[in-house]
């Protein structure tokens, strides 16, 4: 093959439309937001993620101004702002790589269910001697292995949902790299356990091939077609006479892609050529194809027999005379040596360290006990590609350095990393530094303090990552993820109950509740963890929200449940005041149903008693009692039952807990205009005496609240005296007259 021929197998970079000015050329159907996601730095070529979704705070060619930003406790509360004169705008800031999608929520929930269902198997116990303990360890390993498989399935489903979404290319590749690391981890530690090695060999081989071949997708179809197109441009040579064909064939074999390798041999027309040219070579290749078809994945003993046949075939071909070119003979001999597990040839035809590692496990000695040796030889031949985030973690996994993979995985996806740490700890791959063999009396003060800290280093890496992830979920502002966060903290294998209780108490008031179901969930957590003070805080928050929505009754009810009795009393009196100012019942069917003793009128809204009992508390009944009396007063007034109406009004006026300024309100709105100005409405001696006594003891012209309230009253009713002092004089005159009427 000439140099020109070999160049055809290389990429022609001149044919690619690389970005010259750092701006990605996207199709016109992309939205502005998606286009922003693909802008690149003109110097480094790195993808630029804008701070804000829409307009940028500082124009590209505008004046230089200081830009600052502040992170909020929730992901959507981050703000950027310019500290310059006359700049008051706030810009919502989106943190890059923060996933708030529905697909992510479903993924997190799925992983949490796996974690929860592990039960006692979340904790690894060192196996001891004995039949019972041996069976327990076997069952524990089987449960944890199934959980690992379920985690992989959840991640694959998540990747499938993200794959075709616009603007999420980076997220897709990060998840794929996480999946590659998990596939390697499962292959090395979650399939072959003790006595189950032989029966799980087939599953191990399948997992090994899945890890290797999904990691990079090589060789791809384009490369294969490129190899087979060489024959069209190489004069006098067939495709199977080129080194590229045999490199491809051996690569497929090393990766365990045996059906594809057989397909390449058949497509190359090698067998028809050998059939007409060299019977020995034809038999060797034909037998090798049959051996590849019968590769034993399920049995080590069968593998030894299979390999023995391959070695005999290779030796027979090497010692036989052939009628083909020396170059083609060398290619076929190398092919047979690769299948036979020859170390030198496996390393020669491997393009990466993981291809040779896979080749050793498939064709040399399929034992994980030799994995460290295989890895060392593979790395000496092909170093780790540091541009792939997954390669070094896979090397660390094979080397047994499980702790080292967690920071890399966390940089790819914190959720996957946290649950990976959990499953590794359950398997016993990473241990809890804090020894669990001490009795509670053996702990020092320092130990006790660390037990009370869920983030103590002594709790282990898995505990730290799970608890950190729980806090991260709370910061996303997605209420669907809060049960997962609380569940992670509650199920933590480390930390005391009081430590978990303290953390939950700190988090729960920040829950972004919307519906009644959300509130019931919060309160159920308070009951489960015995958090009465947090329940009161929740009721207070509810009360303030209801107050903002002008739902006074429910607001008062929540304040009452929170023990905020001063607020209950204050807002109950405000209802009383509002009703007095209007001179009639408030237009609130719930309030009127609470205070009504009579059957509802035809136009009243009927509210079932059980609902009222749920709303009304004992403190509410007490604080709303003045409004209830006032409501009955309105009913008697409307029926013109003046005697009974006056009796109720006097009950309010002489009520010992009536705020001072409300005396002016009752007198100015009801007593003076209805009973004192009308000479036809008689008052008995006791009633007049009661009013006089209250006026003399409680009336205060200098009281600011009373003065302000009276000014508000006379703005609506010009017939009243212009001042409280004048009103007081008129009151005394009218009371004297009423007293005279009573004697006459």
From Swiss-Prot:
GO cellular component labels: nuclear envelope; nuclear membrane; nuclear pore; nuclear pore outer ring
Keywords, in A-Z order: Membrane, mRNA transport, Nuclear pore complex, Nucleus, Protein transport, Translocation, Transport
Gene Ontology BP terms: mRNA export from nucleus; nuclear pore localization; nucleocytoplasmic transport; positive regulation of DNA-templated transcription; protein import into nucleus; ribosomal large subunit export from nucleus
Membrane topology: Peripheral membrane protein
Full protein name: Nucleoporin NUP85
Homology family: Belongs to the nucleoporin Nup85 family.
Protein localization: Nucleus, Nuclear pore complex; Nucleus membrane
GO MF annotation terms: structural constituent of nuclear pore
PANTHER family to which the protein is assigned, alphabetical: FROUNT PROTEIN-RELATED, NUCLEAR PORE COMPLEX PROTEIN NUP85
Keyword Membrane annotated: yes
Keyword check for Cell inner membrane: no
Self-association and partners: Component of the nuclear pore complex (NPC). NPC constitutes the exclusive means of nucleocytoplasmic transport. NPCs allow the passive diffusion of ions and small molecules and the active, nuclear transport receptor-mediated bidirectional transport of macromolecules such as proteins, RNAs, ribonucleoparticles (RNPs), and ribosomal subunits across the nuclear envelope. Due to its 8-fold rotational symmetry, all subunits are present with 8 copies or multiples thereof.
């Amino acid at each position: 093959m000439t140099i020109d021929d070999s160049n055809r197998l290389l990429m022609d970079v001149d044919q690619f439309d690389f970005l010259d000015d750092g701006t990605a050329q996207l199709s016109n159907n992309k939205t502005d937001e998606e286009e922003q996601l693909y802008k690149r730095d003109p110097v480094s070529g790195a993808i630029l993620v804008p701070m804000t979704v829409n307009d940028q705070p500082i124009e590209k060619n505008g004046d230089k101004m200081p830009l600052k930003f502040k992170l909020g406790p929730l992901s959507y509360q981050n703000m950027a702002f310019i500290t310059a004169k006359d700049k008051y705008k706030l810009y919502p800031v989106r943190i890059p790589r923060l996933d708030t999608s529905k697909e992510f929520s479903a993924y997190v929930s799925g992983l949490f269910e796996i974690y929860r269902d592990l039960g006692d198997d979340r904790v690894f116990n060192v196996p001891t001697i004995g039949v019972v303990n041996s069976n327990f360890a076997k069952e524990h390993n089987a449960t944890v292995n199934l959980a690992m498989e379920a985690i992989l399935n959840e991640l694959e489903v998540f990747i499938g949902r993200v794959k075709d979404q616009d603007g999420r290319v980076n997220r897709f590749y990060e998840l794929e790299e996480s999946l590659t690391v998990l596939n390697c981890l499962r292959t090395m530690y979650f399939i072959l356990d003790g006595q189950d090695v032989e029966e799980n060999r087939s599953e191990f081989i399948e997992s090994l091939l899945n890890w290797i071949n999904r990691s990079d997708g090589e060789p791809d179809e384009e490369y294969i077609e490129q190899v087979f197109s060489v024959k069209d441009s190489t004069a006098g040579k067939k495709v199977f006479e080129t080194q590229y064909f045999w490199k491809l064939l051996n690569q497929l074999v090393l990766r365990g892609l045996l059906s594809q390798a057989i397909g390449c041999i058949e497509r190359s027309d090698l067998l028809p050529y050998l059939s007409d040219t060299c019977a020995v070579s034809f038999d060797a290749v034909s037998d090798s194809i049959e051996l590849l078809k019968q590769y034993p994945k399920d049995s080590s003993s069968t593998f030894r027999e299979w390999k023995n046949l391959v070695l005999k075939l290779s030796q027979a071909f090497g010692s036989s005379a052939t009628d083909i070119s020396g170059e083609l003979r060398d290619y076929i001999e190398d092919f047979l040596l690769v299948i036979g597990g020859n170390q030198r040839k496996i390393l020669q035809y491997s393009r990466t360290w993981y291809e040779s590692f896979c080749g050793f496990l498939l064709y040399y000695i399929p034992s994980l006990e030799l994995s460290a040796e295989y890895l060392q030889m593979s790395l000496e031949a092909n170093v780790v590609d540091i541009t792939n985030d997954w390669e070094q973690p896979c090397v660390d996994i094979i080397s047994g350095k499980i702790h080292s993979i967690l920071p890399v995985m966390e940089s790819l996806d914190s959720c996957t990393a946290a649950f990976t740490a959990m499953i590794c700890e359950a398997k016993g791959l990473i241990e809890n530094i804090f020894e669990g063999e001490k009795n509670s009396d053996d702990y020092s003060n320092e130990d006790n303090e660390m037990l009370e800290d869920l983030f103590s280093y002594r709790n282990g890496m898995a505990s730290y990552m799970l608890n950190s992830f729980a806090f991260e979920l709370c910061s996303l502002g997605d209420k669907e993820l809060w049960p997962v966060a609380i569940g992670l903290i509650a199920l933590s294998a480390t930390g005391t109950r009081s430590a978990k209780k303290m953390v939950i108490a700190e988090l729960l008031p920040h829950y972004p509740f919307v519906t009644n179901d959300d509130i019931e969930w919060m309160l159920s957590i308070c009951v489960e963890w015995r958090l009465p003070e947090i329940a009161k805080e929740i009721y207070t928050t509810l009360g303030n929200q209801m107050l903002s929505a002008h739902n006074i009754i429910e607001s008062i009810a929540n304040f009452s449940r929170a023990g905020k009795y001063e607020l209950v009393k204050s807002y109950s009196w405000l209802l009383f005041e509002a009703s007095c100012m209007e001179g009639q019942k408030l237009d609130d069917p719930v309030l009127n149903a609470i205070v009504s003793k009579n059957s509802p009128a035809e136009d009243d809204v009927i509210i079932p008693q059980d609902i009222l009992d749920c709303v009304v508390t004992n403190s509410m009944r007490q604080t709303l009692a003045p409004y209830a009396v006032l409501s009955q007063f309105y009913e008697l007034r409307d029926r013109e039952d003046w005697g009974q109406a006056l009796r109720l009004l006097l009950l309010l006026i002489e009520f010992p807990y009536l705020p001072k300024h409300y005396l002016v309100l009752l007198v100015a709105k009801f007593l003076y205009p209805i009973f004192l100005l009308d000479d036809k409405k008689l008052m008995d001696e006791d009633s007049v005496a009661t009013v006089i006594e209250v006026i003399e003891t409680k009336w205060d012209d200098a009281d600011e609240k009373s003065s302000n309230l009276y000014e508000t009253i006379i703005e609506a009713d010009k017939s009243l005296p212009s001042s409280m002092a004048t009103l007081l004089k008129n009151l005394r005159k009218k009371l004297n007259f009423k007293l005279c009427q009573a004697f006459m």
